[in-house]
Amino acid sequence: MKILNISYSDKFGGAAKSAYRIHKLLNSIKKIKSDMLVVKKLSKDKNVFTIDSTYLSLMFKFKNYLGILLSKFDNNNNPKSYNFFSSPFLQYINNSNYDLINLHWINAETLSIEDISKLNKPFIITMHDMWWLCGSENYLEYGDEKWKK
């Protein structure tokens, strides 16, 4: 089985480190081949890669900055990521020969919600924070239970 793990980074932040450990564990299992697609690669692991392009690197930075700027108009100070903008990762994923996609921490405009709806491969989600439940916030302030509604 070929698995593609997708995360913003492989080593930058707790969720990234956890996703990377899962990727390494999967590669230790016979009959499983795991790769990891990231925006920000910090390891020397040959099975971790990004779509290497100066243009794409600048686009990710610009989209992330724009997303942060848009969040300033929200009266909520919780850390958030809207993931409005489409990603070049979508085309790569859909044209690949992976059997399963594992979505980890895809915030900072790694993949948009619309991109996820266009995936043509089976995927699973590994939750590293509350973003998947809250829609844009990474976690909620204590006592904030609006996400339950």
Give the ranges of each region predicted by the language model.
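N-terminal subdomain of nucleotide-sugar transferases
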Residues: 1-50, 96, 117-122
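A conserved catalytic-core segment of Leloir-type glycosyltransferases
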Residues: 30, 35-100
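Short N-terminal targeting/anchoring amphipathic segment
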Residues: 90-111, 122-128
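Short catalytic/ligand-binding loop motif for oxyanion handling, primarily in non-cytosolic enzymes
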Residues: 12-14, 43-47, 109-112, 131-142
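Short, intrinsically disordered, charge-balanced linker/junction segments flanking boundaries
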Residues: 111-117, 144-149
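Acceptor-binding helix/loop patch of EC 2.4 sugar-transfer enzymes
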Residues: 63-76, 125-149
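Short, conserved clusters of charged catalytic residues that mark active-site
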Residues: 17-21, 84-85, 110-114
